[in-house]
Amino acid sequence: MNEKTDDIILAFESSADETSAAVVKNGNTILSNVVATQIASHQRFGGIVPEVASRHHLEWINRVTEEALTKAGINDPERQLSAVAATYGPGLVGSLLVGLMAGKTFAMVHHLPFIAVNHLAGHISAANFVKATVYPALAIMVSGGHTELLWMEKENTFQIIGTTLDDAAGEAFDKVGRILGLKYPAGKEIQEMAGHGKAVIKFPIAHTEDDFDFSFSGLKSSVLNYVHHHEQVSEEFNRNDVAASFQKAVVEAITEKSRLAIEKFQPKELLLGGGVAANLALRTAFENLSKEYKIELTEAPIKLSGDNAAMIGAAAYLNYKQRLFAPLDLNVDPSLNFARM
C-alpha cells in the first residue's frame, strides 16, 4: 500500500451490542469491516443488558481491531493511516466507553488525529458506499433506538425535522416480537411471518401534533390488546396476520411522514438507513415513494444496515475533510443527537 496516497481511517463502533472495527478508504471503500455480535448473550433477557454488553466489548475489541488491520493490509499504522475514529454517542455509556477508549488510545500511540463520530451520522453515511449523495437530501434513520427524519442541506449537516415521541420503530418490532413469543431481536422473524400472513387487522397509525413526528407506543399497545383479548376468550388468531398488519402499520407511518417532508422540503435525494432499513417492506415502500416523486433514493446496503464500524469510517471521512478533529480527553455522550430544525 502506498504511503497515504488515499485517506484511510481506522474506525471503531461499540454503542450497543456489536463490537466492530473497520478500515475505510476515502469514505466510500471498505478495506475491512469486522463485527462481533452478542445477540446470543442477550436473547434470554429479551433485550440488551448493558453490563453484559460492556463485558463482551472488552473481550472482543482487541481481536476485531487486529483482524480489521490485518485484512486491510495495515502493518504500519502511522504511515498508512490518516486518522482514527470512534463512535462517542448516542448509545449505552459502558459500551461507548470501550470503543472510544480504543480509538483514542490507538490514535495517541500512533500519533494520528482522532475523529469523534455521531452514531446516527454513521447510519446515514452508510449510503456513501453506494454513491455520492446529492444535496439537499432527506435522510430517514430507522433503528432500534431511533426513528428520525433528518434534513441535510449540504454534506455533513444534519437537522431533525421529525423524531419518535416514544418507542423507536425497531424497539416496537422487538416488543411486538415479545408479545408474539419471538426471540430478540424480532425484526427479521416478524418480516418472515408477515410474508406468510395478510395485513387484514386495522392497527392504528398515530397522528402527532407535529407533522413529522412519530409515535409507535399506541401501535404496540393495540397489538398487545388484540393478542390478549383473543387469548383470554380462547379465540384463535393468525400470528402471521398480526405480524403482517403490524409491519404494514409501521411502514405506513414512516412513509406517510416522509411523504409530508418531501412535499414541504423538496429534497433532491432520499437516504434510508438504520437497522430497520433492512426490512424489505420498508425498502419497497420507499422505492415506490421515490418513483412517485421522481426523487433518487439511496438505501444503505442491507449488510451495512446494522451497527458496524465501516459506516463510522464513512461518517468520519466527512469530518476528516473538514479537519474536524476531537481532543483526546473527549468523553462519551449517551444521549447525543442532532439539533432540531
From Swiss-Prot:
**Binding, substrate:** 141-145, 174, 187, 279
Main subcellular localisation? cytoplasm
UniProt cross-references to Pfam families, sorted A to Z: TsaD
Q: Which domain of life is it from?
A: Bacteria
What does the UniProt keyword field contain? Answer: Acyltransferase, Cytoplasm, Iron, Metal-binding, Transferase, tRNA processing
Acyltransferase as a keyword of this entry, yes or no, is yes
The molecular function GO annotations come to: iron ion binding; N(6)-L-threonylcarbamoyladenine synthase activity
Q: Where in the cell is it found?
A: Cytoplasm
Q: Which cofactor does it need?
A: Fe(2+)
* EC number, UniProt record: 2.3.1.234
| Enzyme class (EC, first level) | transferase
Which residues does the record give as Fe cation binding sites?
Answer: 119, 123, 307
Quick one: a GO biological-process term for this protein?
A: tRNA threonylcarbamoyladenosine modification
**GO terms under cellular component:** cytoplasm
Catalytic activity, reaction form: L-threonylcarbamoyladenylate + adenosine(37) in tRNA = N(6)-L-threonylcarbamoyladenosine(37) in tRNA + AMP + H(+)
Kindly give the CDD domains that the UniProt entry links to this protein: ASKHA_NBD_TsaD_bac
Q: How is the cofactor bound?
A: Binds 1 Fe(2+) ion per subunit.
**Family designation:** Belongs to the KAE1 / TsaD family.
* NCBIfam families xref list: gcp_kae1, T6A_TsaD_YgjD
Q: What does this protein do?
A: Required for the formation of a threonylcarbamoyl group on adenosine at position 37 (t(6)A37) in tRNAs that read codons beginning with adenine. Is involved in the transfer of the threonylcarbamoyl moiety of threonylcarbamoyl-AMP (TC-AMP) to the N6 group of A37, together with TsaE and TsaB. TsaD likely plays a direct catalytic role in this reaction.
Q: Which HAMAP family match?
A: TsaD
Q: What is this protein called?
A: tRNA N6-adenosine threonylcarbamoyltransferase
